[in-house]
Amino acid sequence: MKNIFRKRTPLFLCTLFLCIFLPAILLCSHCFDRALFHKITSAYVQSSLEHDALSLHFVMAYPNLQGIHLKDAALPVYSKEASEASAASRQKFLSVLSFLDSKKLNEEERYTYDLLCDRLALDLEESDFSYYEEPLSPTSGMQSELLLLFAEYPFYTADDVETYLSLLQSVPDYVQGLLSYESEKSAAGLFMEKEDAKKSAQQCREILTKETLSSGTHFLQTTFSSRLASLLQKGLLTDKQQSQYEAQNQSLLSKSVLPAWQLLADGLEQLSDTGRTRGGLSQKPDGRQYYAWLVKESTGSSLSMDQLYLLLQKQFQKTYKEMKQTLTTYQELTGGTPDLAPVNDGFPLSDPTAILEDLQNRMQQDFPALADLTAQTVQC
């Protein structure tokens, strides 16, 4: 009996230990994963924004309160090495996240976990298309977008003005990075079409000119003055500071930003004849795959292109039926038809040129021809 008791005593003690301490151990395990997850996400946000003062300011008005401190108040400058380092950093974050047990996170944390993993994986896929991105597109390129972002840059304190001026000062380096990227893109045989390069270069020369800066009417001058006036009115700026900032802004626009934009225009024109493909992405080696990646990146959907196409077709058919039903209901209620083109089972025109001509004829009542308007010069 004593031997049996001695044999069962260790087993009993182990069972008792597990009953008492196992919940605490499991709780600590859950706490560890959750704490590590929060640490990883905080580090990811900080590493993503601390080198991009422009993006950071639009995301957070007071980043210091979130423990995020700028490494340098400058625009991020492209280099092949920096791009590779960024991809390596994303891979590192994804690898660390894979060690976590997402089941130990709460519902909100699991949702963030899934989103972050998908985002990092998607960003890493982009490295397969190194030179397919076009930052200088004539439709929405940085040659115009960056200046518009500067115009919308909010000033909450005088420190924001200092950061803004530092960003203007970094524009030449930023442009050099853009030209380096476009040169590498050209060497890879993926430079934009000649017509697009010419349009982008023309935009560089037109959106910022010596004449508008001399007259003080450029939008980067007028919006800057307006934002300073707002700070002055709130008592966050002195008259002396306002005058000093106005002078610095004028100097940087004339001596840094304008020459950089002229350099960008020259660089695009020099590379304009190096584009080897015409007809858009579909004609480039991995153009279709990059387009599929773009759709996934833009929509957040994991559906294939064929699946998305079918969804769109179903939606178009549903919308078309609803339009026909609305027209039928209108006719039943009023006995007439609205002043719109009749809805037929098939679109009356199929030739692209004929469709555009028909549209131009229909829009004349609401939008008169340019020749009928008085020519006026619009200053931004």
Language-model features: where?
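N-terminal Sec-pathway targeting helices
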Residues: 2-19
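N-terminal maturation segment of proteins
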Residues: 12, 23-380
